[in-house]
Swiss-Prot record:
This is UPF0145 protein Bcep18194_B0595. It comes from Burkholderia lata (strain ATCC 17760 / DSM 23089 / LMG 22485 / NCIMB 9086 / R18194 / 383). Belongs to the UPF0145 family. Coiled coil: none annotated. Pfam families: YbjQ_1 (PF01906). SUPFAM superfamilies: YbjQ-like. InterPro entries: UPF0145_dom_sf, UPF0145_YbjQ-like.
Amino acid sequence: MIDTTRSLDDLSPARVTTAFDLPGHTTVRSLGVAQGIIVRSRSIVGSFGAALQTIFGGNITLYTSLCEKAREHAFEKMLADARKVGANAIVAMRYDSTEIGSGVTEVICYGTAVIVEPA
């Protein structure tokens, strides 16, 4: 459920959208790109456990958990970046990831930091 009690001075996860505008609000100022980057690696133990899971097929829960945590941390870093410039919303939010080495993955969360007002 969206928290509608928060002040428009606050940037809450409820004011982050993949759309190009925030429903019920008007964008009054664009503050530029906000981003959060996290680089994660698999541990030897985790890699071994995941290798065992691949034998049986299906969801590899160790990697799923690692990916979820990396996205969550990147999202939180993006929120912090947007707060630094005074944003109260983020539009056009996206995730991207790249393997930058053996077992090392970069996850980036980015969007446009904006100031919105009720429409």
